[in-house]
Amino acid sequence: MRGSGPRGAGRRRPPSGGGDTPITPASLAGCYSAPRRAPLWTCLLLCAALRTLLASPSNEVNLLDSRTVMGDLGWIAFPKNGWEEIGEVDENYAPIHTYQVCKVMEQNQNNWLLTSWISNEGASRIFIELKFTLRDCNSLPGGLGTCKETFNMYYFESDDQNGRNIKENQYIKIDTIAADESFTELDLGDRVMKLNTEVRDVGPLSKKGFYLAFQDVGACIALVSVRVYYKKCPSVVRHLAVFPDTITGADSSQLLEVSGSCVNHSVTDEPPKMHCSAEGEWLVPIGKCMCKAGYEEKNGTCQVCRPGFFKASPHIQSCGKCPPHSYTHEEASTSCVCEKDYFRRESDPPTMACTRPPSAPRNAISNVNETSVFLEWIPPADTGGRKDVSYYIACKKCNSHAGVCEECGGHVRYLPRQSGLKNTSVMMVDLLAHTNYTFEIEAVNGVSDLSPGARQYVSVNVTTNQAAPSPVTNVKKGKIAKNSISLSWQEPDRPNGIILEYEIKYFEKDQETSYTIIKSKETTITAEGLKPASVYVFQIRARTAAGYGVFSRRFEFETTPVFAASSDQSQIPVIAVSVTVGVILLAVVIGVLLSGSCCECGCGRASSLCAVAHPSLIWRCGYSKAKQDPEEEKMHFHNGHIKLPGVRTYIDPHTYEDPNQAVHEFAKEIEASCITIERVIGAGEFGEVCSGRLKLPGKRELPVAIKTLKVGYTEKQRRDFLGEASIMGQFDHPNIIHLEGVVTKSKPVMIVTEYMENGSLDTFLKKNDGQFTVIQLVGMLRGISAGMKYLSDMGYVHRDLAARNILINSNLVCKVSDFGLSRVLEDDPEAAYTTRGGKIPIRWTAPEAIAFRKFTSASDVWSYGIVMWEVVSYGERPYWEMTNQDVIKAVEEGYRLPSPMDCPAALYQLMLDCWQKERNSRPKFDEIVNMLDKLIRNPSSLKTLVNASCRVSNLLAEHSPLGSGAYRSVGEWLEAIKMGRYTEIFMENGYSSMDAVAQVTLEDLRRLGVTLVGHQKKIMNSLQEMKVQLVNGMVPL
């Protein structure tokens, strides 16, 4: 690397003779030396120039500067008649060390100048700056054949400070140095002096120090100064973090990462780091420190908050003045103390003013209707400075004679509620008739429970009127016969007077329009003339002087059959029927034993009956596995499916006549002694799910998941349980859960699979909300799609694809599991499995599968789109709280789930493609895998997010944006989602109604100061949930 520096300029007369004597800075600087030296004005000019060059940049640390060495340099020149030192002093008598050589008339010059040992002070890369003058060979008469215009520079690394015995060939050449400008006799005549500056770097260095050497090969040169230095990034304070002096790296392109330390009274927000470049510059700052609570940033330091000011959190930039009704007399306050009779809840932000309980409600009025009372009032004059005012109703029953009151008790009902009332009205029902009551209406707010003062309430005294009795609640059956039912009951809890009679209404079930009324003064009746073996519905109500009460709830009782015996009849008819049935069954068995025709029909499904009815006839069937032809056995095992070499085809285990045969063909039997159950991790449809270890002979121990079949299972449950193993055993793919084997020869019956440490995908995502990059989420989706492609290629339909049925291991590998609802798809692309009833997971199921119960690989693609939505939303419930019927209706009308927050546009478009109504328009799983692979290979395509405003604008407009007023105020909504701290901010920025809140976007939240990602997501998700009540949240296709 060649550098150029400042060029000193001076004027002097040419020397009188000696053409081989150069004009040297040393001779020019000899202000007080021999008369043969340069004039005084020239040396003063050069000395001044040299002094201006002494200051080095702040990022350069000198290891040697010949201009500043006060004593002898200690350099060695050889041969002795080569380099010579010209020792001069400036006007301050400071030495100036200069070396010159000018052997241009002699051939084969080899003059060396060696420096003393130079310590590198830990630097691995150093720089050498040379300042020199050089005579133009053309200006030297007679020296053209021997004169040179370059010289060489070398170095030698050494830990020895006294090692001067270094051979020439041990030195390593740094470079050949040439002058940018050389001087001639014309320059001498014009009084111009030309000074060259060259810089070279050396590295990496591995020892403690080094020597420099300069070789002259026949030039006329003067070495004015030598400066050796290394570069550093100087100590600096950035973002309240101190970064120390840092020596640059050995590589010219290397960036050294340096960690900073926070200044006093500050804490780490994100660990502060910067990168030191090879040129000694600080680059790429990362992270920062923040002044801790009670301190604020000023001039790069953290200054204490003054009395009367506070700062509650490091995330707040400046100290703020204490809010109303609070104060602080201390420095470094993190909160302010409330004034007397003012309070602050723990959930109130420190920036909120201190508040007090409200005054009493005003102008309470009552309206009595028999045994119910309606109260109404107006809000208190003083709300205490809070917006969370609610009301509590205290009820007291008073004795008009003694003037004593007691609590009403639990029988009184309050509509809508007793406490937490937001409206200024309430109704009390189920009061006692002819009773004096006192109702106290108390206004409370968020700090009422913190105040030791007296309750603030208004009282209302009322007397109830005469009322009808309450409903009959406890009805018991008595004697039941084929034509009659006897019942008894207890008096109503609140008769509200003397019971005059009871009215009993009954009718045959599902024939309510034809009923019978019986009246009784007792609490028992017998209804007669009923039909045998029929269900009857009874309702009872009481009557007082005030009239009838309401009917009781419905009670159902069934009469006995015609042949059934009542409590006082004999058991003869029952015995007779039992004997008759037994005779019929015996006749059937004898008929089967006498008839061998079932075995003459070949080896169909009747063969199993043949073996049970007549074991001696098994040989006639020709179906015993021991005697079976291998080809016949093969055809039987595959039940008509032809297996081509190299082609894997799924075989439905339900087509096997003997389900156990399917299990043994596709699943490996494991000895129970090889399995160690460690703990229960869940419960399945058939029993417990455990984790444990599997140690097979000659193989390493494996962690496994173990499904067990519960005790007391039926044969059908056993078949269904092992059926899943028969399905899993046919699959071999890294994204399909792997079956290790089954245990069927001992109890409990077990299915053993690989163990997935992180469990189900939906639960895992909820636990790790927002913790993964988009690429990681796409990687999960890619694994799921690869597994589904494998199943689809085998002609297999899953039917229940959802995040809950995807398992994920510690390496974030997703695997498809849970084949309980799965069925086979034939080779015909139009074939589909028709279910035989049963539950369908509506939120994940394609519309054609819901409507016609037809399942195809295309319906699995629809379900995969829902899984994509679950993954990107970190396990949110699809369609939130919409009912299944609302989901079916919305999807049928063409609406789709909105994009999750911060969802890449490419992923949401793929979701919408999976949700095409026409199943043939949906992508195939192999196309989905290819699309996701492209996204992974090109991460920049995932940076474009679905526009938040578009997500809102695409929602249905004909419905209320907030679900028909689910919340009456912004404060109530924020409190409900535990975000009440932002109430004041919303109100101050004009979001005072729920309709205004409906238009809030993510950018609006950031502008309002909601900076925590978790809080942003909670608020946006709540808004989105409200928007999708009924079908508000669906995006039309």
Swiss-Prot record:
Keywords: ATP-binding, Cell membrane, Cell projection, Glycoprotein, Kinase, Membrane, Neurogenesis, Nucleotide-binding, Phosphoprotein, Receptor, Repeat, Signal, Transferase, Transmembrane, Transmembrane helix, Tyrosine-protein kinase. Residues 965-1029 form the SAM domain. The active site is at D800 (proton acceptor). Residues 675-936 form the Protein kinase domain. It catalyses: L-tyrosyl-[protein] + ATP = O-phospho-L-tyrosyl-[protein] + ADP + H(+). The keyword Cytoplasm does not apply. One of its GO terms (molecular function) is GPI-linked ephrin receptor activity. This is Ephrin type-A receptor 5. It comes from Homo sapiens. The lineage of its organism: Eukaryota, Metazoa, Chordata, Craniata, Vertebrata. The gene is EPHA5.
